[in-house]
Structure formats: C-alpha cells, structure tokens
Amino acid sequence: MAKKKKFVLSIDGGGVRGLIPVRILESIESRLAHRGVSVPMHRVFDLMCGTSTGGLITAALAAPKPGGAKGEAAATLSDLRDFYERDSREIFSQSLGKRLSRMVINPFGLFDETYDARPLERMLKDKFGWTSMASALTHLVLTAYDIERRRAVFMTNGLESNGSRADDYYFWQAVRATTAAPSYFEPARVENLSRKQDEALIDGGVFMNDPAIAAYLEARKLGWDAEDIVVLSLGTGHAPEKPFPYEEAINWGSLGWMQIAKGVPLLSIFADGQSQTASYQAEHLFCEMGCTRYIRLNGDIPAEAEALDNARPGNLILLNGAADKIIRDNTVLLDEIVDMLIANLHSDNGSPHSGSLVNAA
C-alpha cells in the first residue's frame, strides 16, 4: 500500500475576496463527489493554515460544530459561500447615521476603525461557540500579530519547536484576531487559555498574508517528512490593473497612505507584496528541495474588485467571475489534485480520521 501523503491547505488573506478560495474548494469537493467520494474538508487536509479571511475559512472547516454530531465541522463550504455572498454585507456595512457621523468626526476614516466589530463577533460566537482550538478536527494554524509584545503569533493546536503543546485559544477569539485588519476593525483582545492572560492581536496579514511557508514549517514540526508533504496554496486574487499613480502618491503624506477611500494603499501594498514574495519563495524553495509538492492557485481580479470590504452584489459577481476563470484555467490541475486526494484517502490506514469515504460528511 502506498505511503500516505500529508496534504496541507494554505489560504491567503483578502477580506470578501475569500469567496475565491471557497469557490476553488467547492470545485474540489464537487469533483470528489463526482468520483463517489464524500468527505468533509478536515478529512481531506491533514493541516490547514490561514491568514485573515483565510483563517476564518480554515477555522470554520476545522472547528467542531457546537452541539453537532461527532466529526461535524462548524461550517460547510456551502455555509461559507453563503457567508461571503450574503452575510458579509452585515459585517461590512454602516447605517446612514453612522456614515454621516463618521464624515464629521472621522473624515476619510483616518481617526477610527471603519467598522464596528460587534456584528462580526456575534457571528463568530454563534458559529464557533466556546470551543477552543485544542478541539480542532485536524491540525490548524492561524496567524496574528501581538501589538503589545511586538511578536508574530501562530495560533495552533500542534506542537511548539521544543515539543510542548501550543497555547490554546477560543476559536471565535482566534478568528476575530486573525481578521482584525488595522483601520478596518479594532485590535482583538483575546484570552490565552494556556497562559491565563489576555493578548492584543491584529490581522496576521501585516506580516504574512500568504502563510504557505508557515504551514510547511508547522508540518515539519509535527514530524512529517518533507517528501510526504503536499502544499495546496490558495490566493484571493491579484489586481494588476489597479496602480497607485506616482503623481498621486507623491502628495499623499502619512495620512494619504492610510485612506480607506483609496483602499488603504499601505496595507494593500504590504499584503499584495508579501503574498507575491511568499509565493515566489515557496515555489523556488520547494522546487530546489525537489521533495515537497507545492501547488499555487490564484488569478487576476478586476481593479474595482480589490477592496477587502466591498460586499456589494455587483462586486460579488466580479469575484465569482474571477473564481470561475481560475477554475476553468486550471481544470487539468484540479483533476490531478483530486486524483491525488482520492489515492491518499484510500491509502489512509489507521488514521484517527479514517472511515467510509462515502457520505462521511
């Protein structure tokens, strides 16, 4: 029997553009079902890693559903698609009164966060309850940054480099932290359950918008051999046709670089640049190693679809169109991925997640 591979899923940050990786995963799920294999994503992937919106997706697929059946995840891919296409409008919305108030006391979104985090927090509590990351149905890594201790934080249910158990966090708070994009939401105050202390965390996208290399390193910490690891990295789209013109940028000053109306250019450049760099590094690193399989799926999106917070119906149509093109352009590769996944599921002998491949969701 072939040795079981370790499939690792990594998803970038990108706000409402998280709809794109959800659609790609739906395509994989549909292809599996067409081949007679029906399993939840936490059985397909041995480790999931996400930043920001990617953290929300991976956590929802890996967390146990409060009050659900054994092995039932907090959300299905269909649930997540509904969130992006319908519920995200509540997260990224403001009442007329609040918009008028902000125009007076917070022009250009420079002196306070753009959105009230309470609707997001209510949704997260409803979806995750008070379960903690220690109860995850598969290995999981979420990125964040501690603004008080000035350090990168990798929230995981795996192992530290010294072999000890990682710090534990409530799922809903961990997701609130990894999605706390500066200028969009306030920093998250979360409880470190292991250390019995609070931490002030913000979106991991400030240092690692594409967490593929972090996902690989976590896999190695777990003792997995490099030749057994397959990394599937999903992007949230790239807008090559949305430049920041020199003639405008030279007059922005410190406040202009953070203007919400311009899509927060500084954060946009940081996130896009880091994702491109991480993808470049991963592709060449894994190619040079010649042992770990690395697969990156991403694509171009229209300039007007780049905003992290544009949940209007017209923009969702653009994002769905971009996802359709990525899926269409990578049909052969997606079929190859599904072939590998099915072969791997059939070679699963003795895994704690093993069981029937049909109607296992």
Regions found by a protein language model. Give the residues of each.
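Conserved catalytic cores and adjacent C-terminal regulatory segments
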Residues: 1-361
